[in-house]
Amino acid sequence: MKKLFAVLLAVLMVAVMATAMAETTLKVAGWDITTTPYYTAIKEGFEAANPDIKIEWVDLASQDYNIKASTMLSGGDTTDLYCVKELSDLQNWSKEGLVVPMNDMIAADGYDMSKYAGMDACYVSMADGQQYALPFRADFWVMFYNKDLFDKAGVAYPTNDWTWDEYAAIAREVAEKTGAYGTHYHTWLSCVANWAVCDGVNTLADGKYDDLVYFYELYQGFEDDGICMSYDELKASGMHYSGAFAQGNIAMMPMGYWYASTLIGYIKDGTASMNWGIAAVPHLEGVAAGSSFGSPTGIAISAASANKDAAWKFASWMCSEDGAKAIATTGTRPAYVSEGVAEVMASAEGFPTDETSKGALLPAAIALEWPIGEGVNEIKTIVNEEHTLIMTREVEINEGIAAMEERAAEYIK
């Protein structure tokens, strides 16, 4: 009898252990997974806190992410969660029932939504008022610069209060004195045109684009004089901005703050070796110093997920203070705002220690890159198309601007 009891007890223990060891694997779609360190920090932090759930990242190409993610969602792909790159995409996904509303989950957990500085509102559907994603990153644009090239040129580092005209003069001076590129513009529309929205008044969807002329002229002047790489060269080579700056022959590069984590990683693994810093992006006269543009990056749960409870557990952790601290260790700015998170950001290994770089973490204002509204997707397509024609010199700047306004007028309500 004792032997039988021992056998039954052993079987029971095995069954209990097997149940305890049962794991749920969540597939989470994002972009630039292998070059963005915070994905690893999120995975490791969450799995340590939740050993019964494993995270498997699904890496989609950055330039194709919106199209690929939308195709996967509409096709019923079993990927559980999707990072949200564009606010307009989430609006479409929610209208089509492709992602799960989170309001009931938020209420059931008593989840604190007060720590996002209002950025969570970007993920509320205009159609039904439901919350369809939570923000985990709060990206805004800064100026990255190579201190070594500035030192070589004998030029003072950028400050957090400088104008676009001052930036232009500095780019030319450093290029002239070092033979390096004074600045670098990636091929995105935002790298050239979005500075016009930093005043918080203009938008790229308002149908008025005269304010873009200054920035196109600025860029083309740089390109003509070899101060930056040409648009055609970059498009033909497919060079990624992260690798371009890491080569060490570019003095400045306006880019989203997310690049800080990549650059810190490059310094650690030897891909890059320069001393670097960040400053606030330049401003136009009459616009507050430290003004920038940006948008949150969020996480949404697929309606096709078979693991919605586990998916919510991951999303809510990723966007919480614990998740924010994990993200901040890589030099990335989380969406969750607290003193604890700020302390982690400032102490991230590899982050510049100078006061200008620290000050650049606190922008005066962040304008939304694209507003949310009817017709915005169509206008975005138009602006990008005409932007490409201007950048490739197929049309004159004023001709392209006029075409933007004429074509966008059809969608202005």
Task: Annotate the PLM regions.
Residues 48, 54, 129, 153, ...:
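Extracytoplasmic/periplasmic substrate-recognition and gating elements
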